[in-house]
Amino acid sequence: GQPEPQLCQYEALHMCLTDPINTYLRGNRKRGTVSKDRWGTTISFPEDAPGPIPVHTPELTVCPDVTHWKDTVHVPDLSVCSEGWEECRTRSRAAADAEGKLLAGFMGTGIFEQCHFLMGFEDTLTALYEHPDEMRELIETITQYRLDYVRRLIDGLQPDVIFSHDDWGTKNALFMKPDMWREFFKEPYRRFYGYIRSRGVITIHHADSYLVPIVDDMAEIGIQVWQGTLPENDIPALQRHLSGKLTLMGGFGAAIDRADAQPDEILAYARDTLARCCPGGHFIPSITYGLASTVFPHVDQYLDQAVNEYNAGLHIPVTPLPAVPKRKISAAKAEVVQAATSAQESADVFENIARALERGQQKKLLSLCQQALDEGCRPSDILSRGMIVGMNRLGEAFSANRAFV
């Protein structure tokens, strides 16, 4: 949760963008061109743009009417991507191992994005309200496609990580109400990320968006790293709320990535982000884009410099502790140590430890702690699930005469 040293941006990942499926689906996207993807969506990639974008006009939109989506939407056949895996896997694994990095398989255009690539952004959001049944059918079809895709990718590439894209909001808000996201997209993604986790692969979800209202859902459905965490999400507050359930990768927003950004400005921005976010743990400082590097290379240089400087210093991590119960004299007088023991001790060694501490039975407590260690229990569990439980039961009556560690 609080590594030493702090990871720097994408340095832990070797991203494979040349696997047979990604090459088949996105290989014709070239800067300065207009092309069609395998779903039939027109993709424009202007010379001066940071990335490609879908084009929607009445003539070009693949699915202009979701009530007839089965007539116009044709899922790409990934069975044609059966060749070239061994060469790709061998080359990518060798490169990742040589760099001491994790091999990451890349999956662009997630379930929501695929919907608006086919229909247009406004029509997708409108259809969620006006045609929910048809949208569920389309989403299920895309989900099945993504599950087939990731199965083939894991089988063929054997990656350590799957890096999957799907933007769910702007920098200030979700694209839809949280309950609507839960209704249409939460369960499909639970299946998607659940499958990846079942294969022993790390899950990273890219969304450079404001996602505070659904961050607990993201952790629940199996996302391990949220890449693209914008500063607008209030990262320190999220760290306190999540308590390690989700690693946040981001913090360096697009506002600093400018041609006129000066070294002192970039360093000051990065240092402030590091000082606020790194002590909370489960944080990887990074540009929030969905692939490594900034648009303007000099910005990346100074962001990296700030992280390296941070790592050269001495930092004391923040360790959250459970709240200490208030202690009142009146309650202490009312509290008495139970004299009698129950006829039958609980089979739970942690419960027995809590009871022994609560009753002030020092020898028994020490004996039970040794028993727990002999049974393979972790010291941290003995403390948190046994001793601290007993202390909390004592509450206001807790004192040096009543309990001990």
Question: What are the language-model segments listed below?
Answer:
Residues 59, 75-81, 398-405:
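Short gly/ser-rich anion-binding loops that grip negatively charged ligand groups
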Residues 46-67:
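Short, surface-exposed, low-complexity cationic segments
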Residues 333-405:
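Long amphipathic alpha-helical segments
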Residues 1-6, 36, 45, 70-332:
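Active-site loop segments of alpha/beta catalytic cores
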Residues 2-26:
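Segments that shape or occlude catalytic/ligand-binding pockets
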